Amino acid sequence: MAAKDVKFSRDARERILRGVDILADAVKVTLGPKGRNVVIDKSFGAPRITKDGVTVAKEIELKDKFENIGAQLVREVASKTNDLAGDGTTTATVLAQAIVREGLKSVAAGMNPMDLKRGIDLAVTKVVENLKARSKPVAGSNEVAQVGIISANGDKEVGEKIAEAMDKVGKEGVITVEEAKGLEFELDVVEGMQFDRGYLSPYFITNPEKMQVELTDPYILIHEKKLSNLQSILPILEAVVQSGRPLLIIAEDIEGEALATLVVNKLRGGLKVAAVKAPGFGDRRKAMLEDIAILTNGELISEDLGIKLENVTIGMLGTAKRVTIDKDNTTIVDGAGAADAIKGRVEAIRKQIEITTSDYDREKLQERLAKLAGGVAVIKVGGATEVEVKERKDRVDDALHATRAAVEEGIVPGGGTALLYATKALDGLKGANDDQTRGIDIIRRAISAPVKQIAQNAGQDGAVVAGNLLRENDETKGFNAATDVYENLVAAGVIDPTKVVRTALQDAASVAGLLITTEATIAELPEDKAPAMPGGGMGGMGGMGGMDF
């Protein structure tokens, strides 16, 4: 075990604060519409240019182990805010720095750190209540676009594309961001349910130009197990042929003989048919097949449910208006499922999302939810160079998370004013003792930091701007850093998602509280490297040639 270095009280706290300041000072220059870029050197490839707080924070590693502890804890604030709200990482970092600075000053003045933390927690609870009370639900796609524009640093095209995507796939729909080949933004929307399984044989193709299978008004047979021969489904195949409608078979697999028979029947024109493998694996596959059954008003043919293939009737098959299959994906559009049944299934999946502890499971459940409730939209981000594409993609990701947060918990006026005006919620609030009251004052001061930093990045005096706003006492009014004007921020489209502001404050206060109550820090001592062997050959060996043997 390597030897450790231990620092105590004032020495420990000063080192931690230095680390906090280094990271926060690098991150906070990106805040607001006039925030600056940060260039990050890479060990390979071109440097990365970004205005994304969490990206900057993740790149910072300090040489001094004790300073690094402070930097890493603030980095944790940015990461946690990013995970929970997807945006607001720079605001969270600015708040954490402000709380730590004020808190450590108070500790140095002899106040009790535990009481300070209790006061901080009390004040944060009050501010969060105030934010929730002032929050307004998002009204229409125009406000969704505005949230996106603000989060993407004033990029109008980004906000509008996200609003359009949300319009098309709904609040539950999946929106993903990819890099495009060209220069422009593109939006691809997949209607209906899509899963990543293509046709089992190219002989099923009905549209050779697009290399796709297109089935109109098909029956859909959903089978949990493998199909190795068609003997058991001959009665149902005959019934489908007589109906004159196409058939889609979804099964775990369709093996040699069964597949060959289907292909021959398709080529002879007797049966319009296509077959695909079931999506997913294990229990997830069964759940996805049940989703498809509910969406298409069919039944999952499963021995667990006591249904055998021989007993399947045409009434057990699902139907849809259209099915499109290419070599990679199958898309079912306009399934005949009952709205109530689909709604019930959506609610069941939502409950599973709430109780699951695995991020992977949550992501897969959300995908299933989107496929049932909405659709899938892909925003493709273009640019002239790889560096530009990556920077724009960062902004689109931020904007997308911010708009989702806005839809979830509503919006408050932006530009840091929501927190600034929340200081009124702390008027008259007292702790159980003077130290707790000082903790409340720390939050009162800290929540004005984002407004001051946004103004400072715009070339204004932050303290003057914050003072002007508090003097005016008009909660709708704020400082629009993009135009250097005091105005109604909601009317001007400068709005923040309540969830982002709330999460930023809670995460910042949580980690700052831990730092304030730290009395000792432990870090590994750097190892002394052994001196290298001297270079050159072994001297004095040249005379060995004269030895007698």
Swiss-Prot record:
Q: Does the keyword Isomerase apply?
A: yes
Drop me one GO molecular function for this one.
Answer: unfolded protein binding
Supply the EC number(s): 5.6.1.7
Which Gene3D superfamilies does the entry mention?
GroEL (3.50.7.10), GroEL-like equatorial domain (1.10.560.10), TCP-1-like chaperonin intermediate domain (3.30.260.10)
Q: Which UniProt keywords apply?
A: ATP-binding, Chaperone, Cytoplasm, Isomerase, Nucleotide-binding
Give the record's family classification: Belongs to the chaperonin (HSP60) family.
Known function:
Together with its co-chaperonin GroES, plays an essential role in assisting protein folding. The GroEL-GroES system forms a nano-cage that allows encapsulation of the non-native substrate proteins and provides a physical environment optimized to promote and accelerate protein folding.
What this protein is called in its record is Chaperonin GroEL
Tell me what organism the protein belongs to. Rhizorhabdus wittichii (strain DSM 6014 / CCUG 31198 / JCM 15750 / NBRC 105917 / EY 4224 / RW1)
**Gene name of the record:** groEL
